[in-house]
């Protein structure tokens, strides 16, 4: 299965440079609503089977146009909710830069635990477990490779992508997840493949749709690379 990790559109908190965290009622701003509408066009023609989202309002608003267009009822999963930033929640980013913990978040995020909140290592653990669980469930339900969307938050996406890359959490700040961006991971029996990171372009198509199989055709023909293996030298498609 292939998951499209969709970050919510730009929010009213993004606009004023505060850390929204799990604050109730943080909605999309005007640009964010435009981004949500544009997601439908960006994913046109892709066989998306399911949408899973964070319980927070900005994620609900982001997937509403897509869910309506596809006739899907999004599933809410608390495990892909925003980081619980504790007492950092609602504060100006410019003020947080002055906190001693800021340097830890930047340089050793695996050790960062937000005061009154949770640690980034726990965020990665819960989010990766959720994504992999949904991926297995949907693979069984749809008997093979298909696409699904998980609408979540920037640090959550970065943590999941780091896991898929086999990168230590302490390097996850090297990954970017802009508002309304899409990062794509294909999970196989042996390993994940990271197809896109922070895609913000018009259409998301390359490498996402599996080639249709002919009835009775073997999973892998002689001379073909198994789907769970990487092509030595790079893809030839």
Question: How would you label these PLM feature ranges?
Answer:
Residues 11, 156-157:
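Short active-site segment of divalent metal-dependent hydrolases/proteases
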Residues 65, 159-163:
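Active-site signature of alpha/beta-hydrolase-fold catalytic machinery across serine-
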Residues 2, 6-7, 12-72:
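Active-site-proximal alpha-helix that buttresses catalytic centers in soluble enzyme cores
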Residues 37-44, 124, 128-139, 161:
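Generic structural signal for well-ordered alpha-helical scaffold segments
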Residues 18-27, 91-92, 110, 211:
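Short glycine-enriched, charge-decorated loop/helix-capping segments at active-site entrances
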Residues 69-129, 196-199, 208, 221, ...:
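Phosphate-handling substructures
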